[in-house]
C-alpha cells in the first residue's frame, strides 16, 4: 500500500506530526512501513505557462513554445505531442540538473535545435523522478496547489510531500485504503477524522426519473447507486500521480476515477453507461429509463444484468470502456462478505478481476456512502460533472460481531495491568461500541462493520495492545513449568513399544488387523462372542459383524495368506485391543510362529524347527520372567480358559499347551496349534501360538540385587516321583524352604517307563553358591541332603541310584 502525506490530509490533519515518528508508530501498530522518502524536485524547475506555440520550420514533430515564468518569457523547443497553449507546465531553467532522462543525468543549457534557440526544457513526470502518467509533458493543474508563475515546483503542496509504503497483512483489508490508514493514525494520536462537506452541482432531476433497479431475489450483497452526468471528462494531476505510483493508472479516465475512489475509501466502485442499460419498453416523460436487474447468476453469485450480464458483484467489473465524450453514468458501490466471496471463488473456480477480488476477499469498506460520495464530490470538483439527486440503496442485514469479555481477561492476555478507563477509551477510539451487562464483571464489545478480522477476545486484546504500544510493555522472562505428564498411559505405551522392539529383534514381524471379526469364525475356533444385546447394530460387512475377543483368529488367517504366497517360515506378532463378552476392552499381545527357526545352512545340515520350548523362551525373554504350567495340571483350568475368552481347548494341542504365569499370576496361554484345526484351516501342522494380556503383565523396572563373587557349584539328583506332579510345584517348594546355599533348581531330564508304573524319573540340577566364601565339600553334601529330605517329605520322592 503506497500513499502520501498529501493524500492522508483528505481525511485527517497530520501536518503537525513528525514523519519519522509517524512511521515508527505505524510499524508498532502492525502496519510495517517498508519505505518512506520525501519527494525531491530538481532545483530550478519552476511553474510556467505556455503562451503560444508554432510548428518548428525544419522539424515535423517539434514545436516552438513561448513560455512565461512570471519574470520573463522563454522560447523553448518541445517535441511532446500533448503540448498546447495556455497549459501550466514544469519548466527546467538553464542550469537545472535533470536526473531521469533517457540519456541519464543532464544539465539544462541554452541550445540550438535545428536553427531555433531553446532556453530550457518542458519536463515530463518521469524526468522529474515521478511515476509515468502519460507519453508527453506533465501538465499542471489546481490539484498541485496555487500555480504562481516562476515558483519552484518543489514548493507546491503536491510535490512537497512524503511517500510512504506499508505492508498490509491479509487480515487487515480495512487498511487497503487511504481512509483505513487515516483511521489508524487518528486512533493512535487521538485525532478527529475530517467531515465531508456537501456537494455542489446536484441537479434537481431525481435518479428515479432515469433509472429503475429491480432486485429479483435476496442476494447477499449491499448496493448503492447514484447517477452522474459527465460533460467534459478530465483526470487531474493528483489522481494520475497517485494511481501511477500504485501501478493502477490506465488510459480510461472514468476507470481511473473509480479506482481512485476505491483506493481512497476502500469502497468497491463500478460504473455503467446509462444508455447501455436503456430499456426501450419503458418510456416516461423524459423519454428514457435505464433498467438494472440484480439477481443471482449460474454460480449463485449476485450479478448485475441489463440486456446482458454486466458484472459479478465483488468478483468481476465486466467490460469497462467509457471513453471521453459526454456521458451519463450509473455509479455503483458494493459490498459482499469476504468469506462468502472467497468460498465461492474456491468452489466454482471463477476467474475474476485480480485487483477486485484481492480487495473483496480481504474485506472492503461496507460504508458505501463514504465511497460513492467521495467519488462524486471529486468528479464535481475537477470535472464538468452533475450529480443527480437521490440514490438507490439495496441493503441486507449485517450481523454485528459482539464479543463478551472482561477487563481482567484483556489485561491477562496483554500481560500488564491497564486501568478500565484506559482500555475503554482505546476501544472507543477504535470505534468499538461497549455495552455493560447485568454482570458488572463482563461487558459486550460490538466490532465496527469494517473490521472483518475481529472475531474473539484475543483479537480485542491485540487491538488494545496495538494502540497502547507494544514498546510500552516491559519485557519479562517467560515463566514456564512443565507439568508431570508421565502417567500409566505413557508407561503402557512405552512398555508395549519396548516389547514390540524386542520381538522385532528376534525376527518377528508386527502386523495390524481390524478390531472387527467374524462371529462364526470366533465360534468355530472356540472363542467367546459378545453378548447378544451388546453386538454391533450396524456392522460394516457381514464378515466383520462383531468385535474381536482374541487376536489369534486374524493372526492365523495372516499365516494362511503368507503360506499361500509361498512363505514357509512365518513369525508374526500383534499388540491390540480385544473385548470380553461384556464388551470390556483389554490390550493383548499375540505371537504366532510357523515353519522353521532356521533353514538348512552349514553347520546346520538340517533345518531347526520350532518347538514349544524355543517358542516359550522367546516369549520369556521379551515379556519378562514367565513360567508355564500345563493346562491339565490346573484345577481351575476351565475358569482360566473362560477368563482368556476360550470356550474350550479345541484350538490347543492336548499335550503341548500351558497357561503363562508371571509372579504366580496367570496372564495368558501358550500352545501348539491343534493338528485338526491346522488341517481344517489348510495350515502347516507346526504352528505355535501365544496370547498374553498386557494389562496383567509386570513391566516394573528391573531390580538390582547383590550377587556373590564366589564360584557356583552344581549337583545333580535323579529321583522317582509321582508323574502327575508338575515340576513348577517341586521348584516352588524347594525355593520356599530357603535351604542354605541353594540359588536355583531346574530340570535336566524326565523319563517314563512302564516298569516305573505311576512314577517318573526326574533329573534336576541344583545350583549352589555362598555369599561369604567358597563352599566346601561338606557344605555341598549337607545342602544336597537337605534338598533330598524336602523332596522325600513333600512328594515321597525316592533317590534313584
From Swiss-Prot:
Gene Ontology CC: phenylalanine-tRNA ligase complex
Location relative to the cell: Cytoplasm
EC number, UniProt record: 6.1.1.20
Protein name as catalogued: Phenylalanine--tRNA ligase beta subunit
Start and end residues of each B5 domain: 398-475
InterPro entries: aa-tRNA-synth_II/BPL/LPL, DNA-bd_dom_put_sf, Fdx_antiC-bd, Fdx_antiC-bd_sf, NA-bd_OB-fold, Phe-tRNA-ligase_IIc_bsu, Phe-tRNA-ligase_IIc_bsu_bact, PheRS_beta_core
Record keyword RNA-binding present: yes
SMART domains: B5, FDX-ACB
tRNA-binding domain location: 39-154
UniProtKB keywords: Aminoacyl-tRNA synthetase, ATP-binding, Cytoplasm, Ligase, Magnesium, Metal-binding, Nucleotide-binding, Protein biosynthesis, RNA-binding, tRNA-binding
Catalytic reactions of this protein: tRNA(Phe) + L-phenylalanine + ATP = L-phenylalanyl-tRNA(Phe) + AMP + diphosphate + H(+)
GO molecular function: ATP binding; magnesium ion binding; phenylalanine-tRNA ligase activity; tRNA binding
Principal cellular location given in the protein's record: cytoplasm
Subunit composition and interactions: Tetramer of two alpha and two beta subunits.
Binding-site positions, Mg(2+): 453, 459, 462-463
Cofactor field: Mg(2+)
Gene Ontology BP term (one): phenylalanyl-tRNA aminoacylation
UniProt record similarity statement: Belongs to the phenylalanyl-tRNA synthetase beta subunit family. Type 1 subfamily.
Pfam families according to UniProt: B5, FDX-ACB, tRNA_bind, tRNA_synthFbeta
Top-level taxon of origin: Bacteria
Enzyme class: ligase
Domain FDX-ACB as annotated: residue spans: 708-800
Cofactor binding, per record: Binds 2 magnesium ions per tetramer.
Keyword Ligase attributed: yes
Amino acid at each position: 500500500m503506497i500513499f502520501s502525506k498529501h493524500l492522508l490530509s483528505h481525511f485527517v490533519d497530520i501536518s503537525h506530526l513528525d514523519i519519522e515518528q509517524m512511521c515508527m508508530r505505524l510499524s508498532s501498530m502492525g502496519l510495517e512501513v517498508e519505505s518512506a522518502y520525501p519527494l525531491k524536485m530538481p532545483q530550478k524547475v519552476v511553474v510556467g505557462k505556455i503562451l503560444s506555440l508554432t510548428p518548428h520550420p525544419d522539424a515535423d514533430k517539434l514545436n516552438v513554445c513561448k513560455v512565461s515564468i512570471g519574470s520573463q518569457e522563454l522560447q523553448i523547443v518541445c517535441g511532446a505531442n500533448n503540448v498546447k497553449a495556455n497549459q501550466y507546465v514544469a519548466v527546467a531553467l538553464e542550469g537545472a540538473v535533470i536526473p531521469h532522462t533517457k540519456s541519464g543525468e543532464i544539465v539544462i543549457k541554452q541550445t540550438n535545435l535545428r536553427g531555433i534557440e531553446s532556453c530550457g526544457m518542458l519536463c515530463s513526470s518521469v524526468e522529474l523522478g515521478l511515476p509515468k502518467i502519460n507519453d508527453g509533458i506533465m501538465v499542471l493543474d489546481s490539484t498541485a496547489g496555487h500555480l504562481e508563475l516562476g515558483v519552484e515546483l518543489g514548493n507546491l503542496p503536491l510535490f512537497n510531500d512524503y511517500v510512504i509504503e506499508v505492508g498490509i497483512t491479509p487480515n487487515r483489508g480495512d487498511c487497503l485504503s487511504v481512509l483505513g490508514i487515516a483511521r489508524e493514525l487518528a486512533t493512535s494520536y487521538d485525532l478527529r477524522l475530517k467531515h465531508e462537506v456537501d456537494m455542489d452541482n446536484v441537479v434537481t432531476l431525481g435518479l428515479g426519473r432515469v433509472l429503475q433497479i429491480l432486485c429479483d431475489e435476496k442476494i447477499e450483497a449491499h448496493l448503492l447507486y447514484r447517477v452522474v452526468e459527465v460533460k467534459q471528462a478530465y483526470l487531474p494531476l493528483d489522481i494520475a500521480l497517485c494511481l501511477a505510483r500504485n501501478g493502477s493508472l490506465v488510459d480510461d479516465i472514468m476507470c481511473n476515477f473509480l479506482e481512485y475512489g476505491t483506493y481512497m475509501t476502500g469502497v468497491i466502485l463500478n460504473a455503467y453507461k446509462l444508455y447501455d442499460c436503456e430499456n426501450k419498453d419503458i418510456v416516461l416523460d423524459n423519454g428514457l429509463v435505464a433498467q438494472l436487474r440484480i439477481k443471482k447468476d449460474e454460480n449463485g453469485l449476485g450479478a448485475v444484468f441489463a440486456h446482458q450480464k454486466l458484472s459479478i458483484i465483488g468478483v468481476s467489473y465486466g467490460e469497462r470502456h467509457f471513453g471521453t465524450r459526454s456521458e451519463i453514468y450509473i455509479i455503483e458501490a458494493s459490498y459482499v462478505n469476504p468469506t462468502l466471496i472467497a468460498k465461492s471463488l474456491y468452489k466454482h473456480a471463477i476467474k475474476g478481476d485480480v485487483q477486485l477480488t484481492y480487495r473483496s476477499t480481504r474485506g472492503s469498506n461496507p460504508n458505501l456512502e463514504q465511497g460513492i460520495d467521495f467519488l462524486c464530490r471529486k468528479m464535481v470538483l475537477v470535472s464538468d460533472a452533475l450529480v443527480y439527486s437521490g440514490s438507490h440503496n439495496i441493503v441486507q442485514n449485517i450481523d454485528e460481531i459482539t464479543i463478551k469479555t472482561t477487563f481482567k481477561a484483556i489485561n491477562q492476555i496483554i500481560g500488564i495491568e491497564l486501568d478500565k478507563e484506559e482500555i475503554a477509551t482505546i476501544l472507543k477510539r477504535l470505534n468499538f461500541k461497549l455495552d455493560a451487562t447485568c454482570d458488572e464483571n463482563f461487558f459486550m464489545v460490538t466490532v465496527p462493520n469494517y473490521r472483518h478480522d475481529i472475531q474473539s477476545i484475543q483479537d480485542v486484546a491485540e487491538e488494545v495492545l496495538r494502540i497502547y504500544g507494544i514498546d510500552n510493555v516491559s519485557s519479562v522472562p517467560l515463566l514456564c513449568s512443565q507439568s508431570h505428564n508421565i502417567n500409566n498411559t505413557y508407561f503402557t505405551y512405552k512398555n508395549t513399544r519396548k516389547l514390540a522392539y524386542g520381538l522385532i529383534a528376534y525376527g518377528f514381524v508386527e502386523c495390524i488387523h481390524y478390531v472387527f471379526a467374524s462371529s462364526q469364525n470366533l465360534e468355530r475356533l472356540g472363542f467367546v462372542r459378545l453378548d447378544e444385546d451388546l453386538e454391533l447394530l450396524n456392522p460394516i460387512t457381514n464378515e466383520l459383524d462383531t468385535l474381536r475377543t482374541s487376536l489369534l483368529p486374524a493372526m492365523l488367517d495372516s499365516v494362511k495368506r503368507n503360506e499361500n504366497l509361498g512363505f514357509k517360515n512365518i513369525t508374526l506378532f500383534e499388540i491390540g485391543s480385544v473385548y470380553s463378552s461384556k464388551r470390556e476392552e483389554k490390550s493383548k499381545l499375540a505371537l504366532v510362529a510357523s515353519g522353521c527357526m532356521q533353514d538348512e545352512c552349514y553347520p546346520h545340515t538340517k533345518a531347526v524347527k520350532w518347538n514349544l520350548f524355543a517358542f516359550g523362551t522367546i516369549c520369556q525373554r521379551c515379556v519378562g520372567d514367565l513360567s508355564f504350567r500345563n493346562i491339565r495340571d490346573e484345577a481351575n483350568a476351565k475358569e482360566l480358559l473362560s477368563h482368556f475368552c476360550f470356550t474350550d481347548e479345541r484350538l490347543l494341542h492336548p499335550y503341548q499347551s500351558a497357561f503363562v504365569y508371571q509372579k504366580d499370576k496367570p496372564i495368558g496361554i501358550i500352545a501348539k496349534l491343534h493338528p485338526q484345526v491346522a488341517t481344517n484351516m489348510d495350515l502347516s501342522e507346526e504352528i505355535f501360538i501365544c496370547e498374553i494380556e498386557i494389562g496383567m503383565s509386570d513391566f516394573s523396572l528391573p531390580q538390582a540385587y547383590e550377587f556373590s563373587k564366589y564360584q557356583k557349584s552344581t549337583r545333580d539328583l535323579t529321583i522317582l516321583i509321582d508323574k502327575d506332579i508338575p515340576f513348577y510345584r517341586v521348584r516352588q517348594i524347594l525355593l520356599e524352604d530357603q535351604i542354605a546355599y541353594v540359588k536355583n533348581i531346574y530340570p535336566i531330564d524326565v523319563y517314563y517307563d512302564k516298569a516305573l508304573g505311576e512314577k517318573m524319573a526326574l533329573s534336576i540340577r541344583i545350583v549352589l553358591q555362598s555369599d561369604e566364601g567358597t563352599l566346601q565339600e561338606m557344605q555341598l553334601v549337607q545342602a544336597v541332603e537337605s534338598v533330598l529330605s524336602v523332596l522325600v517329605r513333600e512328594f515321597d520322592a525316592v533317590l534313584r541310584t
